[in-house]
Amino acid sequence: MVEDGAEELEDLVHFSVSELPSRGYGVMEEIRRQGKLCDVTLKIGDHKFSAHRIVLAASIPYFHAMFTNDMMECKQDEIVMQGMDPSALEALINFAYNGNLAIDQQNVQSLLMGASFLQLQSIKDACCTFLRERLHPKNCLGVRQFAETMMCAVLYDAANSFIHQHFVEVSLSEEFLALPLEDVLELVSRDELNVKSEEQVFEAALAWVRYDREQRGPCLPELLSNIRLPLCRPQFLSDRVQQDDLVRCCHKCRDLVDEAKDYHLMPERRPHLPAFRTRPRCCTSIAGLIYAVGGLNSAGDSLNVVEVFDPIANRWEKCHPMTTARSRVGVAVVNGLLYAIGGYDGQLRLSTVEAYNPETDTWTRVGSMNSKRSAMGTVVLDGQIYVCGGYDGNSSLNSVETYSPETDKWTVVTPMSSNRSAAGVTVFEGRIYVSGGHDGLQIFSSVEHYNHHTATWHPAASMLNKRCRHGAASLGSKMFVCGGYDGSGFLSIAEMYSSVADQWCLIVPMHTRRSRVSLVASCGRLYAVGGYDGQSNLSSVEMYDPETDRWTFMAPMACHEGGVGVGCIPLLTI
């Protein structure tokens, strides 16, 4: 009964001590150290570790399954553990009690192996991050092999990207010289190698052979057949390659040198040479010609116009036009060919595709997509073209298709988790990242990435700003987005993403607001091409230098007014 004037109190009060769970675990850890109330002993070799079943089951999935599913071990006082380092097991038992773990160069691999065995995914991820942050030309090959053994796909792809980016330094390491033939062949054949010229690849291969000349000498013909000798300078072929004693005493090697020299002496025979050996590599750090394809004019008409920009000469030149007018077109480069994919011709969304050969300045129709689409994202991964999302004339799409140049066929793969039109799409560390875009109702800041090994999509950290119709590209160990539209205004702001931190940060904005902008990497820099500033289409181009964090205006396009698709074909380094 409440007296008049007294404050009425609740009949039920909830009392809690938020720190009790963590404090309780600390007390249990102290009890364990005193050897009290322990009900299980883990034995590995000559080492024994006492613990409490309830703590192990609550903290470690492996023991949860063991102790709650009537396995034989659940009734044993002593459990024999196999295939783990004793110090790693002890550290992981301690982690079960206090949530703390010290990772260093000496224990990271044993901890990762132990965490994998005990199904502690968070620790496995932390160990992978530790290794990824410490990749170095002297250890990256070993880290890649370890990641493959432990089925750590993200670490494996990061190590692979690091190897490609730093190939010249990696080729000087003991790890490289100790590689088996099949691994060296796989490396020297990669399109993604960051080399100033094919001559560096030749020197790396020759150093590997000379490291064990007697055993590896017979491997030289196979190695040279996977190196793009025709792209070496004629003087280098004559003075260095042809004069090497290992090459001179091998008939097959001499034939490959002759083929490379013919490439320079008889240009008319180039189409008859093996395409692989005459195809430039496509690392974004080397120089490449930037092609601007299609787009819109000031009247809003779709264009078939194509022009090419030489970033070294800072000059645009007109190329042969496409067979079809295409705006909001996807562009990709594979095997030295430029593909114009889908888009909008002014009346219809397109599924058709055509390929441009810069040597002949001609366009050729190739296989059409399964779905018509414009405003989609287009990238190349492992020699395959991927198109993601877009707009089919009725709605935004989440569907994804991949194209094989070898079979001229398109295949539907796992769709994105969200419908996205006008998203930014780029390949980064062996994954396809899709950022922002819209679904017709809302504009996104969210990001997801595709693992082509498992055909699965996964979320990544969202951008700081929602945006669609923006540019996206990767360069070195970072991914970038710039410009776009956020629903209320046209953007000049740009962001940079680090996968190690899984977070975005702002970089210096562009000088100009740009929606419908294309972003592409060449010469170790980013080029923002064209766009729309809210009033008019743009022919201007800005170049971003990551070393100075500055944007600089470059020569404007000569034939376009904005909204172009772009692709970069590496320059022949001869």
From Swiss-Prot:
Kelch repeats lie at residues 289-336, 337-383, 384-430, 432-477, 479-524, 525-571. PROSITE patterns: BTB. It holds the Pfam family Kelch_1. Pathway: Protein modification; protein ubiquitination. Residues 140-242 form the BACK domain. Signal peptide: none annotated. The keyword Calcium does not apply. SMART domains: BACK (SM00875), BTB (SM00225), Kelch (SM00612). InterPro entries: BACK (IPR011705), BTB-kelch_protein (IPR017096), BTB/POZ_dom (IPR000210), Kelch-typ_b-propeller (IPR015915), Kelch_1 (IPR006652), KLHL18_BTB/POZ (IPR030603), SKP1/BTB/POZ_sf (IPR011333). Predominantly expressed in maturing and mature retinal photoreceptor cells. Interacts with AURKA. Interacts (via BTB domain) with CUL3. Interacts (via kelch repeats) with UNC119. Substrate-specific adapter of a BCR (BTB-CUL3-RBX1) E3 ubiquitin-protein ligase complex required for mitotic progression and cytokinesis. The BCR(KLHL18) E3 ubiquitin ligase complex mediates the ubiquitination of AURKA leading to its activation at the centrosome which is required for initiating mitotic entry. Regulates light- and dark-dependent alpha-transducin localization changes in rod photoreceptors through UNC119 ubiquitination and degradation. Preferentially ubiquitinates the unphosphorylated form of UNC119 over the phosphorylated form. This is Kelch-like protein 18. It comes from Mus musculus (Mouse). The gene is Klhl18.
